[in-house]
């Protein structure tokens, strides 16, 4: 059986929990047909991912793509069994992507939380950053708050969607606007560094008013359809989620958080022969999950 993705995922989640010591851990996956809404806006959305798998590959040579897909489906199903044993909440909502689920939960819990930390390498989450929401990039090992986003991009989080509408996103196969890079944006659109939301209407109005100032403004108008399309694709603050799905998310989040089930986790662990990855399972379970389990108990 192929469990490489499971071990990597559990190790990563465990390290994150130990490092940040949260009172609650929520994990979101893309739901079935999660990309459908964005593909209806742009048919080639994520087309570059057609043959990529969602869980990390194990060191295994598959004879066919079908064999690999079977292995990935097994890994995901098995991962769910492991997560069922841990004091975490996990969701995969049909018809929406993980980004949308996380954005909705962050919005719902914004006022009742001291701090929300989103763990992801996805820059789309920078648009959510404010005084309560921060984003941890595990690859860069860097925490993004409002100041960090401003320092790195010279763009305020409130205007991050518009900025990325110019630059695009190769990982999602979203094309940027050729000839308008970060430096050009900073020079001609300094308004994006302010906390005031700069809208598509503001952009269009300024470009029409400044055609004689620079060719950049004509280029913006020539590519406005692309910018507008990208804005719709990359905006996760709009919360274009069906009411029924929102209700389901709220229902799942309102349920008691499961308690740590050591016995079942250990059974799965030994069945999958994962001791080479975690040398001392009892210590890993105690040091990683016990405090989170104590918080979970308060929800019962």
Which role does the model predict for each range below?
Residues 1-119, 125-143, 235-254:
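Noncatalytic, basic helical substrate-engagement surface that gates or grips nucleic-acid strands
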Residues 156-159, 167-243, 262-266, 270-285, ...:
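Accessory alpha-helical DNA-binding modules that contact the DNA backbone or grooves
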Residues 123-124, 183:
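Acidic, divalent-metal-coordinating active-site segment for phosphoryl/phosphodiester hydrolysis
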Residues 299-300:
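Long, compositionally biased intrinsically disordered regions
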Residues 253-263:
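C-terminal/domain-terminus segments
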Residues 70-77, 154, 224-227:
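Alpha-helix N-cap/helix-start motif at coil-to-helix transitions, marked by capping-box chemistry
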Residues 162:
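Conserved active-site carboxylates
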Residues 143-153:
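Short, charged, surface-exposed secondary-structure boundary motifs
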């Amino acid at each position: 059986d192929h469990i490489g993705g499971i071990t990597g995922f559990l190790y990563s989640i465990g390290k994150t929990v130990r490092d940040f010591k949260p009172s609650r851990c929520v994990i979101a996956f893309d739901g079935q047909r999660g990309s459908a809404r964005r593909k209806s806006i742009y048919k080639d959305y994520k087309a570059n991912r057609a043959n990529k798998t969602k869980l990390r590959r194990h060191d295994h040579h598959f004879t066919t793509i079908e064999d690999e897909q079977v292995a990935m489906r097994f890994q995901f199903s098995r991962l769910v069994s492991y997560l069922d044993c841990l004091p975490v909440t996990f969701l995969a909502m049909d018809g929406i992507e993980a980004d949308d689920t996380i954005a909705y939960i962050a919005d719902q819990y914004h006022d009742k939380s001291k701090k929300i930390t989103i763990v992801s390498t996805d820059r789309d989450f920078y648009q959510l950053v404010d005084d309560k929401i921060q984003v941890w990039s595990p690859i860069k090992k860097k925490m993004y708050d409002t100041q960090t986003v401003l320092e790195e991009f010279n763009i305020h989080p409130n205007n991050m969607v518009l900025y990325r509408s110019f630059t695009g996103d190769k990982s999602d196969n979203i094309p940027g606007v050729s000839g308008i890079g970060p430096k050009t944006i900073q020079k001609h659109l300094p308004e994006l560094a302010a906390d005031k939301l700069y809208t598509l209407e503001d952009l269009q109005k300024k470009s029409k008013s400044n055609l004689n100032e620079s060719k950049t403004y004509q280029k913006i108008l020539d590519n406005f359809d692309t910018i507008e399309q990208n804005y719709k694709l990359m905006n996760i603050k709009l919360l274009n989620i069906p009411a029924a799905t929102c209700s389901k998310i709220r229902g799942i989040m309102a349920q008691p958080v499961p308690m740590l089930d050591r016995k079942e986790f250990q059974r799965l662990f030994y069945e999958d022969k994962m001791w080479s990855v975690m040398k001392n399972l009892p210590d890993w379970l105690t040091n990683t999950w016990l405090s989170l389990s104590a918080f979970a108990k308060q929800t019962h």
